[in-house]
Amino acid sequence: SGFGTPAAVAAPLMVAMGFQAAGAVMLGMMIQSTAVTFGAVGTPVLVGVQEGVASPEFLAMLTASGTSMGQYVNAVAVRAAVIHGITGTLMPTLMVVMMTRFFGSNRSWTEGLSILPFTLFGGIAFTVPYVMTAWILGPEFPSLVGGLVGLAIVSFTTRRGFLVPEDTWDFPDRKNWPSDWSSDLDKKSNAVGERAHMSSPKAWAPYLILAFFLILSRL
């Protein structure tokens, strides 16, 4: 992950699932928020903070206080995780509200709030392991571990109907979509035939293996 690839990958997948191209781009850009702090295995913090403050005067100040650069970077990571975790908890709700307001039949803000318990739960499922990982392991893994753990929790509970609202919401009929909602990708995705099926464990195996070895290297 990192360098904007999650949004670049997620938006076409959402279009293939039936989202409008404009809506998929909007949601993809919104989700590029909380996790970005520790994207690319912590590059913004590890490189940005260390290179940004590593002046002789600052290093001397750290030495005088008995703090190493590594300890300082980890402290920055924890504080950033807490601040961004608070806003990240609300991000799923904001995404749904924006979707119902700008891409729903009724153009309603409040329709999106009907799923508030579920979206708050989804946000917490990501941000709690996100903050804990920053505190325990440092800046390399909060986004990676938070995303994988959150996905596992929400997928498991959703299959069992936990906090899933009884009412369903959908986009307007495709024939009523304004022209600026769609792109050529919509037409191409509709024309794609059936592909070979891949099991979920096989599809997720590369990401899980990568996460395992990255975490193992820091223990």
Spell out what each predicted region is.
Residues 89-219:
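Long, contiguous bundles of hydrophobic transmembrane helices that form the permeation core
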Residues 1-113:
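Hydrophobic transmembrane alpha-helices that form the pore/transport pathway of multi-pass ion
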